[in-house]
Amino acid sequence: MRIVVLFGSEMGTAEKVAEAMADELNGSEVAVFDMSEFDLADLDPQAFHIIVCSTYGEGDLPTGAEPFFEALDAQQPDLTGLRFAVFGLGDSVYDTTFNRGGEIAAAKLTALGGSQVGDHARHDASTETKPAAMGREWVRTLPFDTRQLSMTAGTAG
């Protein structure tokens, strides 16, 4: 099974978390993409998708995620069969909009037929927990067997 990690960032933290997750899944078939450069046609129901998304401004999606979600809104693709997990980044100082970027991402993908699996992670910048470290730990809890992924990486499907 292929794993696709998509990140949407404003200041680069989501990218660092996405790269840390890919490192943690070393040996698996993992590809990391900036959402701003990802083509919706490449959303593959056979792959497992990890969405790493920060929150910007008043609870908005970050600039780096806007093109991806604008394309989703415009094209309305059928995402039935697409499995995804979400790692959100935010700051609890912004109580009412804390981690809203990840929540928006999950809602949009689910509304189009995608299935969110695993715990929705919500990193809080107001804590001492480093986002990349939390991402590494969280990715190990996702409902796929990395040993199985390693064995199938590189095989024709």
Mark where each language-model region is.
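Extreme N-terminal starter segment of soluble prokaryotic enzymes
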Residues: 1-4
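Active-site neighborhood of thiol-dependent amide/isopeptide-bond enzymes
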Residues: 7, 11
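FMN-binding flavodoxin-like domain, especially the glycine-rich phosphate-binding loop
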Residues: 12-16, 23-24, 28, 45-48, ...
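A short, well-structured beta->alpha microelement
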Residues: 28-40
